[in-house]
Amino acid sequence: MTIAKIRCRLFIMKDKIIDAAIRRVPDFPKKGILFYDITGILVNPEVFSYCLDKMTEMYKDKKVDAVAAIEARGFIFAAPFAYKMGIPLILIRKKGKLPGETYSASYDLEYGQASVEVHKTDVVKGQKVLLLDDLIATGGTLNAARSILEEGGAKVVGFCGVVGLPFLNYSKVLGDLPVKTLIEYDSEKI
């Protein structure tokens, strides 16, 4: 086994605090999908705080001007993260939820299709933006969010998630930008 594979296996070893809070729900939202439910983190203030502290530690020395969050669960982690980092929060919403002029993009999900949009006024040209979501699966949502931010002139500098599912190959979709997660799972098996 190579050093890279050993490091990968060690990284995929679960953070026990976070792992204990994540519930696995088989066949949701459709048959054959194992859903990693992060609500156990939210009902436990100590685990939620632990996650925010880990995220802040990962990015405290990085050049990030703003964080953009994916609706809806990404908002939950991004708002306190933005506050702790002292940076603005940009909301990436589902299509049809924003009243002003928007940038919009469609994408494929692990289990369907959707569109996201952002207010044009919220995107600042040249701003270095970190994209944050609760879970990174195929990377489709984050890639669509990146495209609308870049359309407005922002520079996406990385992706962050609470949970990562690298076996769904999100790195191929997200390209060469850094992807950081607090915990990763290597399959959809219980």
From Swiss-Prot:
Chief place of localization: cytoplasm
Pfam families in UniProt: Pribosyltran
Record GO biological process: adenine salvage; AMP salvage; purine ribonucleoside salvage
Function: Catalyzes a salvage reaction resulting in the formation of AMP, that is energically less costly than de novo synthesis.
Regions crossing the membrane: none
GO molecular function: adenine phosphoribosyltransferase activity
Known EC number: 2.4.2.7
Signal peptide location: none
Family: Belongs to the purine/pyrimidine phosphoribosyltransferase family.
Superkingdom classification of source: Bacteria
InterPro entries assigned: Ade_phspho_trans, Adenine_PRTase, PRibTrfase_dom, PRTase-like
Key word Transferase present: yes
Protein name per UniProt: Adenine phosphoribosyltransferase
Keywords: Cytoplasm, Glycosyltransferase, Purine salvage, Transferase
A cellular-component GO term for this protein: cytoplasm
Taxonomic path: Bacteria, Pseudomonadati, Spirochaetota, Spirochaetia, Spirochaetales
Top-level EC class as recorded in UniProt: transferase
Catalytic activity: AMP + diphosphate = 5-phospho-alpha-D-ribose 1-diphosphate + adenine
Biological or metabolic pathway of the protein: Purine metabolism; AMP biosynthesis via salvage pathway; AMP from adenine: step 1/1
Record note on quaternary structure: Homodimer.
Subcellular location: Cytoplasm
PANTHER family registered for this protein in UniProt: ADENINE PHOSPHORIBOSYLTRANSFERASE, PHOSPHORIBOSYLTRANSFERASE DOMAIN-CONTAINING PROTEIN
